[in-house]
Amino acid sequence: MTYLFKQIGREWRFMLRQRYVLILLLCSFLVSGFAVFTGLAEVAQQQQTIERLKLADVRDRLEAQAKYNDPGSLAYYSFHLTYSEPSSLAFAALGERDVYPWKHRVRMLALEGQIYESDSQNAELAQAGKIDFVFVISALAPLFIILLFHDLIASERSSGRHDLLVSTAKSKYALWGSRGLVRFGAVVLCLMLPFYIGAMISSTGFQAVLLVSLWCVVYLAFWTVLSVWLGKNLASAPRIASMLIACWVLLAFVLPILSDLLINNSVHSAKGGDILLTQRETVNDAWDLPVSTTMEAFVTNHPQYSDYTHQGEGFDWGWYYAFQQVGDQAAGEFSNDYRAAAANKYKLAGYATLLSPPLLLQRKLNRLANTDALAAFEYEQDIRDFHKALRMAYYPWLFAQEKFDKTHLTSLPQFKDSTHNYKKVQNEQ
């Protein structure tokens, strides 16, 4: 053991005299630091946006409540902010937050149109365009590992020192193990140190930091073992580097793109635009239909309001909100198919990650950070649950002629972000 420590100390001093190694380590530190810095800035911007919108949301709703006195007008002119806050780990894994919406302002109109006004593609397998910490570790770090380890043994062979080093060393495993351990420890430190600083700034929990560290070290060890194994069995450093880079390109870029294309071509569903069009056509057509036609469709799902009677010959808020809901009912089948297809794509993407370690790491860390497609699905369900609770609060005033008083507005449901729940994410791991 003492000999091993001496070897490690010697290899550390030897590494510090190798300029190209130091340059690679510095580059890895700078790239990781840049990714963490931009991640922290993005999360801070999202949090500031949410806080600003919260204040505006309360102000706008109070203005509407001061201006209108009947429940129909209040429901129409009152917007409600919904949002999905970034977790404390989101700075390291921004995930799908640039693909799926994380904020919506909804009101008691047909919900499908409000959700799908901007359609989003399922990009679970699309290669990330942003540079966050997960992208650096999964896609760029293997290149640093390859450059550091491809010639660990081959360079000594080409210089003629290999046989001398092996013959004079007490153990070839201690010789190459200490050299590899020093380089591996150095590159892991350079890549992970910015993450630890970012975790302290964002107050990330210890368990989350530990799990991220574990996944990253295992992933980097995979590339290190692959590089050393090829270097041990091949004599030419350029040939070793070429093979490793080919593996890197295949696993980090080619397989994800092919998997994405295959999944998108094999799973079909209605588009968000189709859902939006169906809902809006139903709502627009309702203006020309008899009130009884709309109410029959409405009470199919809301039988408790079957005694509702249209107030007068003109416009009536109850009828208006009834055909808004009927519009959602008409688009419901398309919406369910769309969401089922998105969930199926995510499931198939999980199988594809078994062929691509970079994708597997991204998927695991995005799940830990609660920034993946599942988090987006949960946020959308929160919106639907909140909208339903809001409707159930207003419907007795609109359809059952219950007495309305503005003091009742204080008991209206409030949106709560349930996606930002680290313990829940851990239970799903």
Per-segment meaning from a language model:
Residues G129-S155, S159:
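Long, hydrophobic alpha-helical segments
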